[in-house]
């Protein structure tokens, strides 16, 4: 009977150890995936900020061109009178 108890405790102990190791590896994998997701998010954020900057510059250039065109049209209209 004592032999069975020792064997059972040994099996339970080894099972707990292996379970602990598996959980640790799982946590490490989740941490690695989280880091990869963070890196991808940072890359996307950087890309969107660049696109936003380019869009702002394009809008400024378009507004400036439209302003010049409007000023030219007004100048022509005033000059014709």
From Swiss-Prot:
Residues 24-46 are annotated as: Disordered. Residues 54-55 are annotated as: Hinge region that separates the two alpha-helices that constitute the peptide. InterPro entries: Dermaseptin_dom, Frog_antimicrobial_propeptide. Amidation permits an increased antimicrobial activity against some microorganisms such as T.album and S.cerevisiae. May contain a D-amino acid residue, since the natural peptide is not identical in chromatographic properties to the synthetic peptide. Residues 1-22 form the signal peptide. GO terms for cellular component: extracellular region; membrane; other organism cell membrane. It is found in: Secreted; Target cell membrane. Residues 23-43, 80-81 form a propeptide. Disulfide bonds: none annotated. Cationic amphipathic alpha-helical antimicrobial peptide with potent activity against Gram-negative and Gram-positive bacteria, fungi and protozoa. Acts in a synergistic effect in combination with Plasticin-B1 at doses that are not active alone. Acts by disturbing membrane functions. Has a helix-hinge-helix structural motif. This is Dermaseptin-B2. The lineage of its organism: Eukaryota, Metazoa, Chordata, Craniata, Vertebrata.
């Amino acid at each position: 009977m004592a032999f069975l108890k020792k064997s059972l405790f040994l099996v339970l102990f080894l099972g707990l150890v292996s379970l602990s190791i598996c959980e640790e590896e799982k946590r490490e994998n989740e941490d690695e995936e989280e880091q990869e997701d963070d890196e991808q998010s940072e890359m996307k954020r950087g890309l969107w900020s660049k696109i936003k900057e380019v869009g702002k510059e394009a809008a400024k250039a378009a507004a400036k061109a439209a302003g010049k065109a409007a000023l030219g049209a007004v100048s022509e209209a005033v000059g014709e009178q």
